[in-house]
C-alpha cells in the first residue's frame, strides 16, 4: 500500500512538473509575441511624421494598397486550387504511386525557400512572357508558396470528418460531388480558414519572392481608373511594391530619402498590425462558423 502510494505521489509530481513546463513554454512564446509586437508598434508610433500615411513618395499608402491587393489576388488563385486539390486527394484519389508522388511533391513544394520561388517566378512569369515586373506575377509566386498549406489543410480536414457524414449523405441519395459540396466542405470551413490565415500572413510578409516578380516601384494615379493604364491602381500588370519590400528598400537603398528609417519603422508597425488583425478576425469567423456547424449537427 505504501509502495503504491509513493508511486502515485511520484507520478503526480512528474505530471505537475511537466504540466508546469508546458505552461511555461506556451507562456514564453506568448510573451515573446507580445514583446516583439509591442516593440515594433512603439517604434512605429514614435516614428510617425506628417504625411507618412499619404499616397505619395514620402508615404506608405501606395505600398499598403499593393500589399492588400496582391494578397487578395493570390488568395483568389490559391484558395480554389488548394481546396480542389485537397478534396481530390481526400475523396477521389486512390492509394498508389501517383497519389504518393503528388503528396511528396506537395511536401517538397512547401519546403522550397521563397527566394527560389521568386527566381522561378522571374524566369516563368517575367522572362518567358516578355512582361515587366507586375502584381500578377507576384501573386502567382505567392500562390506557389500558398498552395501546399491550403491543400494539406483541406485534405487533413476532410480526412478527419466522421464517416457518418459521408454514409448519411450518400444513404439519402446524394452523389459523391453533392456530398462533398453540400456536407463535407461546409463542415471543414473553420479549418480551411485557418489555412487561409497562414497563407495570407505569409503573403503579407513575403519579400524575397516578390523582389523578382512584383518589382520595387509604384507609380499610381488615383484619379485614373482605366484598368489598362500602367498607373491605374487596379491594373494587375503594373509593378507594385509591397510593405515588406518597402521596408527592405528603405533599410538598404533608402539613404536618399530623409525619412527612410521612419518609413521602415511605420511600415513594420502597419504590417504587424495587419497580420495580427487579420488573424484575429479570421479566428473569430472560424469559431463562429464552427459553432454554427455544431449547432446544425445537433
Regions found by a protein language model. Name each.
Residues 3-24, 40-76, 95, 249-261:
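Periplasmic/extracellular loop-to-transmembrane helix junction in inner-membrane transport proteins
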Residues 15, 81, 93-103, 162, ...:
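Amphipathic cytosolic juxtamembrane alpha-helices at the membrane-cytosol interface
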Residues 52-58, 210-271:
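Interhelical loop and adjacent transmembrane-helix boundary motif
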Residues 65, 69-77, 81, 85, ...:
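Hydrophobic alpha-helical transmembrane segments of multipass integral membrane proteins
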Residues 93, 155-159, 170, 197, ...:
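C-terminal transmembrane helix and the adjacent membrane-cytosol boundary/short C-terminal tail
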Residues 107-143:
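Generic hydrophobic transmembrane alpha-helix motif, especially the helices
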Residues 154, 176-216:
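Transmembrane alpha-helices
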Amino acid at each position: 500500500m505504501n509502495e503504491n502510494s509513493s508511486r502515485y505521489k511520484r507520478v503526480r509530481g512528474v505530471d505537475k512538473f511537466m504540466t508546469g513546463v508546458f505552461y511555461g513554454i506556451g507562456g514564453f512564446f506568448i510573451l515573446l509575441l507580445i514583446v516583439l509586437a509591442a516593440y515594433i508598434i512603439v517604434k512605429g508610433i514614435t516614428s510617425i511624421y506628417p504625411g507618412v500615411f499619404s499616397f505619395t513618395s514620402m508615404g506608405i499608402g501606395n505600398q499598403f494598397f499593393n500589399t492588400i491587393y496582391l494578397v487578395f489576388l493570390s488568395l483568389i488563385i490559391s484558395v480554389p486550387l488548394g481546396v480542389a486539390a485537397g478534396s481530390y486527394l481526400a475523396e477521389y484519389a486512390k492509394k498508389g504511386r501517383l497519389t504518393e508522388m503528388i503528396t511528396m511533391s506537395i511536401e517538397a513544394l512547401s519546403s522550397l525557400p521563397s527566394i527560389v520561388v521568386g527566381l522561378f517566378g522571374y524566369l516563368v512569369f517575367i522572362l518567358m512572357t516578355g512582361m515587366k515586373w507586375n502584381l500578377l506575377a507576384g501573386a502567382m509566386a505567392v500562390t506557389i508558396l500558398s498552395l501546399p498549406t491550403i491543400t494539406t489543410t483541406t485534405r487533413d480536414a476532410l480526412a478527419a470528418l466522421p464517416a457518418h457524414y459521408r454514409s448519411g449523405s450518400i444513404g439519402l441519395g446524394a452523389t459523391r460531388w453533392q456530398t462533398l459540396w453540400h456536407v463535407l466542405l461546409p463542415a471543414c470551413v473553420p479549418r480551411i480558414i485557418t489555412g487561409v490565415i497562414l497563407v495570407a500572413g505569409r503573403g503579407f510578409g513575403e519579400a524575397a519572392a516578390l523582389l523578382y516578380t512584383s518589382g520595387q516601384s509604384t507609380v499610381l494615379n488615383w484619379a485614373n481608373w482605366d484598368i489598362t493604364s500602367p498607373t491605374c491602381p487596379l491594373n494587375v500588370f503594373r509593378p507594385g511594391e509591397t510593405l515588406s519590400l518597402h521596408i527592405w528598400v528603405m533599410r538598404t537603398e533608402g539613404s536618399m530619402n530623409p525619412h527612410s528609417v521612419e518609413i521602415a519603422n511605420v511600415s513594420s508597425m502597419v504590417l504587424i498590425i495587419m497580420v495580427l488583425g487579420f488573424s484575429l478576425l479570421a479566428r473569430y469567423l472560424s469559431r463562429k462558423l464552427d459553432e454554427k456547424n455544431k449547432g446544425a449537427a445537433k
